[in-house]
A protein has these predicted regions:
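C-terminal motif of bacterial Sec signal peptides marking the signal peptidase cleavage site
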Residues: 16-19
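Buried hydrophobic residues that stabilize the cores of well-folded domains
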Residues: 23-281
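Sec-dependent N-terminal signal peptides
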Residues: 6-11
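Positively charged n-region of N-terminal signal peptides that target proteins for export
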Residues: 1-4
Length: 281
């Protein structure tokens, strides 16, 4: 879900402004010259017995300032909210997390960026200011991710996982290994189109049981429009589910339709609908 949200936010923040009439200038639901995205709201509508609920549940709310910086992310459905903190250069250096209902402080992330070494590190702390985990991202000088290391500090420095990324002309390969012994946990091969989008992902998961190792293979497929926007994601051959995406005329995401199945009996179906509010600068 994180990747989907990052993709959708990128679509929202990358919009080009369109000209509007004077009446539209005062309409907070219409984008236009001299305006900025102030808020994006995501509402969930569940399906049951072939019918969609008329009553939606507030899923997530994103709020932005005039600099296009995220200033608040509220997640009522998941029960938390976060507040980013920026330095004078406009870089997010910290994120604080709170319980959505009680406003109880949950902890924070501290973020460090080293451009010279192409390294980005996130330190995660709990409400007692104890270090829980450290995640280090390493990039090439062309800003391609090549390695991600997660250390579970609350357990021990040798506990965690490593993701290693490698690239060819039309593929991306991701290998997930155990930090402690280097054993292979998962291998994913993404087939890429001319935009660099994954059109097919094949994932092999390795289970190292005492008597005999077992490997399971999962395949996901992705379809895009002529602008490189995702239209449909077909979930693994095991679940046989899918996600479909529709867009507004200005390119912003309008709706996600999600259906997860076991064989052909769909167990979970819902829509995520996106609405936007704009303000004058």
């Amino acid at each position: 879900m994180k990747k989907n949200i990052a993709l959708l936010l990128g679509l929202v923040l990358g919009l080009s402004f369109v000209s509007c009439s004077s009446d539209e200038d005062d309409d907070e639901n219409v984008n236009g010259k001299g305006k900025y995205l102030a808020e994006m709201t995501v509402t969930r509508y569940d399906w049951k017995d072939g019918k969609r609920s008329d009553e939606g549940k507030l899923y997530q709310i994103y709020k932005y300032n005039e600099k296009d910086q995220l200033i608040s992310q509220e997640s009522p459905y998941f029960g938390y909210r976060q507040t980013p903190i920026y330095n004078d250069n406009g870089d997010c250096t910290e994120q604080k997390f709170y319980n959505y209902k009680t406003d109880e402080y949950l902890g924070y992330n501290k973020r460090e960026l080293n451009l010279a070494d192409s390294v980005f590190i996130i330190y995660s702390y709990n409400w007692k200011n104890e270090l829980v985990s450290t995640t280090k991202y390493e990039y090439t000088y062309g800003y391609k991710l090549i390695r991600e290391t997660e250390i579970i500090d609350s357990i021990g420095k040798d506990h965690g996982k490593i993701w290693t990324y490698s690239y060819s002309e039309n593929t991306q390969t991701i290998e997930l290994t155990n930090l402690k012994d280097g054993s292979l946990i998962e291998k994913q091969v993404n087939e890429l189109d001319s935009y660099g989008n994954a059109t097919k992902a094949t994932i092999n998961v390795f289970y190292d049981f005492a008597l005999s190792p077992i490997t399971h293979e999962y395949t996901f497929k992705y379809n895009y429009d002529s602008q490189g926007r995702i239209l449909r994601k077909t979930h693994s051959t095991v679940s046989q589910g899918y996600t479909e995406y529709t867009y507004n005329n200005d390119g912003t995401i309008k709706k996600e339709h999600y259906a997860e199945a076991l064989n052909t009996d769909y167990k979970e179906i819902y829509d995520l609908e996106y609405t936007y509010k704009y303000k004058k600068k």
